[in-house]
């Protein structure tokens, strides 16, 4: 694995490539990783076999960074030199023009004196023929001092080995110096001016090879791999780290540093020619887990000696490559070979392939050709790159590994306040790509959805994308100014559209005539067809109102102005419907941050219009009249006319608020939770909805204020009027207002006017109930306070008067029951009914009752109110209340300090309606008045757009031709 492809959290490479398995295997980086493997050094991986490594139990010194394994090609051995150890150095070397050779201990032709050789040298043929497996590592706890055989293959042709005593602390530099001394080169003129320079000119190499095949020559050594040991490495420990496979031999060789450098440069040059530069794989030697065979190096150049036949070079190289690979890599090599064969077969079947003269192809060319054969995934959606920013870094296929895929800019940038950078699946390193640029959701259900981030330039099939939209297979997705992708989903099984929507509608030959010149090149529609579509929109009944952000203020102002003026015959909820169309267009078509700004502007316009209307009503109905000018009470008809605009605004604002709440919730769900502007948008929406709440509160308060002000002058008749007048017949339940007793008609007239007003304005049922609840609360408190006040100082609490009040109250409740308000009226008139029922008890029964029984029968009355009614009850001349009516000592304090009057401030709070809005923006507009207003607004927007054009480009709205 490359150092840049770690699975660590700080690097997104491996986890963010989004390539299928086949693509990753065939990528150049994968082969680069294979070429970059090294032999282990003294501080690297310790292996007990050629395929399995285990970490050494002892801490070892780290190797120098230049320690590498190089392939030197086939090194041919020419035979060993004969003679005793005491002979001169000139007798140990013999010139041979056969290239770089080394002896493994067997005497060659023409080398007499083999009987005088050391015993260790006599055993060398057996060692070279096949190295016996070393004892297991478990039996060698600590490396004792030993003798290392250092061959002088790099000194001269035919140089034999020298035995050098080494310990676990002996370094490669020390052993080189000792070996040179044994060879008689230390301090020689050829070696340099001194011993130090002579040692610096040579390096100790760890060589891996095997005897030649049968028939080539018994005991001939052929080096396959070579690694230069660092000066600080311990050769004895290196020897203990691993052993060669059966059939392979390992030995230490003494070579010149210049030769080692040349081999290194040749290896790097071969790697660069295959597209695998050395800087990419050099760091791998310290952390990769290599096989015992090491890394294959470049073959020797034509000028170097080769001990292998030319025809067997490819086979031997393939065997060498297989030696250092695991089973899985060998399987992948077979897969590559099969892919190359299929590619060659495809090329041979191409037209003209039979005539083409194809020479010997470089295997690297076939590898690169195989890498170009990309097979897309079959079970995951992916994006096909059509245009990128940097061809050297961009991939061709980006696979969706999650249901939600995020495109964004790479890097280690953090968010605001030091927060970590947002999670991104695919990094696009273009300057105009945002940290979170675009999000695609492709779940099990189709279609997929694409949502741009705030301020991110995204196009969908060539059109600017501002909101979430559907993404179908074959659609083009543009990110910024550089990236263009095609979305593909193999899971659909070809169920997508037959033709992509971005293709021209007329793919045939260009039709002659002027019609083609006046048509759109992209969609193929002619100018006349486009004009008809525009005319159909301007006059259509679809609930759609399109506008540009620059026209927003004029459009909203026109809708609010028309609603405030009450001009036209719009339906009651027409203004809310038109404003909701504006909100819907902003939520669906315009940018993410536009909706909060529109809601704020809309709420302020409505508030200003309502404030102006309240001020106008206040000027006509002042609270403080000038002295000498009598106050004229409001009639039910007059109050209905005055309150109609306020009631309309209350109804429209209530429905609009419910609609806005739904859209804000949708916006919060759709919005990217990583968007730093999301909180700011939600705050702006909350402020706008708070203004709408305030408008509803004020309109409700003003409406009930003027209604209760009218009721205040009509309610006393319920206590004073006698329903049993001569010739009067009591009406039954559900009677008309004209059939009611005259004393009840003004009060019932106010209730009826309020009921008709709420119905005409289509006020929400919850607000209708709360409006009448407040009216009944006020009526109950006002009548009860008047009843308590009437009993002080005059005989009012009598059975006959109580019967009249009870009858009037029953008639009012029956009429309200017929109007559908019986339950609300019964609940709020309960205390007044309880007080009147107490006064309606016959005198004889009342005298027999005690305080405790009366408290039990009339629980809604407070002790002070009950004591007030009993203490002022008229029992007759000179008769006072009996002692049984006196409260006990435990309630005496409550009677003395309690208030007998009801408080008007304890009214129930206003609760705004919950649930979905009653505005229906689906289906054609059926109301003719609303359709006319919608057409007027569309043409107004058309005129505003035409005013921005030069005079010679302006024209009137198109008119649809009749069929």
Swiss-Prot record:
Q: Which Pfam families match?
A: DIL, RA
Sites bearing Omega-N-methylarginine, chain numbering: 94
Its function?
Required for the proper formation of vascular structures that develop via both vasculogenesis and angiogenesis. Acts as a critical and vascular-specific regulator of GTPase signaling, cell architecture, and adhesion, which is essential for endothelial cell morphogenesis and blood vessel tubulogenesis. Regulates the activity of Rho GTPases in part by recruiting ARHGAP29 and suppressing RhoA signaling and dampening ROCK and MYH9 activities in endothelial cells. May act as effector for Golgi-bound HRAS and other Ras-like proteins. May promote HRAS-mediated transformation.
Question: Keywords, A to Z?
Answer: Angiogenesis, Cytoplasm, Golgi apparatus, Methylation, Phosphoprotein
Record's GO cellular component terms: cell-cell junction; Golgi stack; perinuclear region of cytoplasm; protein-containing complex
Q: Which residues carry this modification: Phosphoserine?
A: 188, 280, 292, 326, 328, 331, 419
Q: State the organism of origin.
A: Homo sapiens (Human)
The Gene Ontology biological process terms listed for this entry are: angiogenesis; branching morphogenesis of an epithelial tube; negative regulation of autophagy; negative regulation of membrane permeability; negative regulation of Rho protein signal transduction; negative regulation of Rho-dependent protein serine/threonine kinase activity; positive regulation of integrin activation; regulation of GTPase activity
Which InterPro entries does the UniProt record give? Answer: CBD_Rasip1/Radil, Dilute_dom, RA_dom, SMAD_FHA_dom_sf, Ubiquitin-like_domsf, Vascular_dev_regulator
Keyword Cytoplasm belongs to the record:
yes
Q: State the protein's name.
A: Ras-interacting protein 1
Q: Where is this region: Disordered?
A: 1-22, 35-118, 267-356
């Amino acid at each position: 694995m490359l150092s840049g492809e770690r699975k660590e959290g700080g690097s997104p490479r491996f986890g963010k490539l989004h390539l299928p398995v086949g693509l990753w295997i065939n990528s150049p980086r994968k082969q680069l990783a294979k070429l970059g493997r090294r032999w282990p050094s003294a501080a690297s991986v310790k292996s007990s076999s050629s395929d399995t490594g285990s970490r050494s139990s002892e801490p070892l010194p780290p190797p120098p960074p230049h320690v590498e394994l190089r392939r030197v090609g086939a090194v041919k051995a020419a035979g060993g030199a004969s003679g005793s150890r005491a002979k001169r150095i000139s007798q140990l070397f013999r010139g041979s023009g056969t290239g770089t050779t080394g002896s493994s201990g067997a005497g060659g032709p023409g080398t007499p004196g083999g009987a005088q050789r050391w015993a260790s040298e006599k055993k060398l043929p057996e060692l070279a023929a096949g190295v016996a497996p070393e004892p297991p590592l478990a039996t060698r706890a600590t490396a004792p001092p030993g003798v290392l055989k250092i061959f002088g293959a790099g000194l001269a042709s035919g140089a034999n080995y020298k035995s050098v005593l080494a310990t676990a602390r002996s370094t490669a530099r020390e052993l080189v110096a000792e070996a040179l001394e044994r060879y008689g080169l230390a301090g020689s003129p050829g070696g340099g001016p001194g011993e130090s320079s002579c040692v610096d000119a040579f390096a100790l190499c760890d060589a891996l090879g095997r005897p030649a095949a049968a028939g080539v020559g018994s005991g001939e050594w052929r080096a396959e791999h070579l690694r230069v040991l660092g000066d600080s490495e311990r050769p004895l420990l290196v020897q203990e780290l691993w052993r060669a496979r059966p059939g392979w031999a390992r030995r230490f060789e003494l070579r010149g540093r210049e030769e080692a450098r040349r081999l290194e440069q040749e290896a790097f040059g071969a790697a660069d020619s295959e597209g695998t530069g050395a800087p990419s794989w050099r760091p791998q030697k310290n952390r990769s887990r290599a096989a015992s065979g090491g890394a294959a190096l470049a073959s020797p150049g034509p000028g170097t000696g080769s001990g292998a036949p030319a025809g067997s070079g490819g086979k031997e190289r393939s065997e060498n490559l297989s030696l250092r690979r695991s089973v899985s890599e060998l399987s992948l090599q077979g897969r590559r070979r099969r892919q190359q064969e299929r590619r060659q077969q495809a090329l041979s079947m191409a037209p003209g392939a039979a005539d083409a003269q194809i020479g010997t192809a470089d295997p690297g060319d076939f590898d690169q050709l195989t890498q170009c054969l990309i097979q897309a995934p079959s079970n995951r959606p992916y994006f096909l790159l059509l245009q990128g920013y940097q061809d050297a870094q961009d991939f061709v296929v980006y696979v969706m590994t999650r249901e939600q895929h995020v495109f964004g800019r790479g890097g280690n940038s953090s968010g605001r306040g030091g927060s970590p950078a947002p999670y991104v699946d695919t990094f696009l390193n273009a300057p105009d790509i945002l940290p979170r640029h675009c999000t695609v959701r492709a779940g099990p259900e189709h279609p997929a959805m694409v949502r741009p981030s705030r301020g991110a330039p995204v196009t969908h099939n060539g059109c600017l994308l501002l909101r979430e939209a559907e993404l179908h297979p074959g659609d083009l997705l543009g990110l910024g100014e550089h990236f263009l992708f095609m979305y593909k989903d193999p899971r659909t099984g070809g169920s997508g559209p037959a033709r992509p929507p971005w293709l021209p509608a007329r793919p045939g030959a260009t039709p002659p005539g002027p019609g083609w010149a006046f048509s759109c090149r992209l969609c193929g529609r002619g100018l006349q067809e486009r004009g008809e579509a525009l005319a159909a929109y301007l006059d259509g009944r679809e609930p759609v109102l399109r506008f540009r952000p620059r026209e927003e203020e004029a459009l909203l102002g026109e809708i609010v102005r028309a609603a405030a003026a009450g001009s036209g015959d719009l339906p009651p909820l027409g203004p809310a419907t038109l404003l909701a169309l504006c909100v819907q267009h902003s939520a669906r078509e315009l940018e993410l941050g536009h909706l909060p700004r529109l809601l704020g502007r809309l709420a302020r316009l409505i508030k200003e219009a309502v404030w102006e209307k309240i001020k106008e009503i206040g000027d006509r109905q002042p609270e403080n009249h000038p002295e000498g000018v009598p106050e004229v009470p409001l009639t039910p008809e007059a109050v209905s006319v005055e309150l109609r605009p306020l009631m309309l605004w209350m109804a429209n604002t209530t429905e609009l608020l419910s609609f806005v709440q739904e859209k804000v919730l949708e916006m919060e769900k759709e919005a990217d939770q990583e968007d730093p502007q999301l909180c700011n948008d939600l705050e702006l929406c909350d402020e706008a909805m708070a203004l709408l709440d305030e408008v509803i509160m004020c309109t409700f308060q003003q409406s009930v204020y003027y209604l209760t002000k009218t009721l205040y002058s009509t309610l006393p008749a319920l206590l004073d009027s006698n329903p049993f007048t001569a010739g009067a017949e009591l009406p039954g339940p559900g009677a008309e207002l004209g059939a009611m007793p005259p004393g009840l008609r003004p009060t019932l007239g106010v209730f009826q006017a309020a009921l008709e007003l709420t119905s005409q304005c289509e006020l929400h049922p919850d607000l209708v109930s709360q409006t009448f609840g407040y009216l009944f609360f006020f009526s109950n408190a006002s009548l009860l306070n008047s009843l308590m006040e009437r009993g002080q100082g005059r005989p009012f609490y009598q059975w006959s008067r109580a019967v009249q009040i009870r009858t009037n109250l029953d008639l009012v409740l029956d009429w309200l029951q017929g109007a559908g308000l019986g339950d609300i009226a019964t609940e709020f008139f309960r205390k007044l009914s309880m007080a009147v029922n107490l006064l309606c008890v016959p005198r004889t029964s009342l005298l027999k009752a005690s305080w405790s029984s009366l408290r039990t029968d009339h629980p809604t009355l407070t002790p002070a109110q009950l004591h007030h009614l009993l203490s002022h009850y008229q029992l007759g001349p000179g008769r006072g209340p009996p002692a049984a009516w006196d409260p006990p000592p435990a309630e005496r304090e409550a009677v003395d300090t309690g208030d007998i009057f009801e408080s008007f401030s304890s009214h129930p709070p206003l609760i705004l309606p919950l649930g979905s809005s009653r505005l229906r923006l689906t289906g054609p507009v059926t109301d003719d008045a609303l359709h006319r207003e919608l057409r007027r607004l569309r043409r107004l927007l058309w005129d505003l757009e035409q005013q921005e054009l030069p005079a010679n480009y302006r024209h009137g709205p198109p008119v649809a031709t009749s069929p």
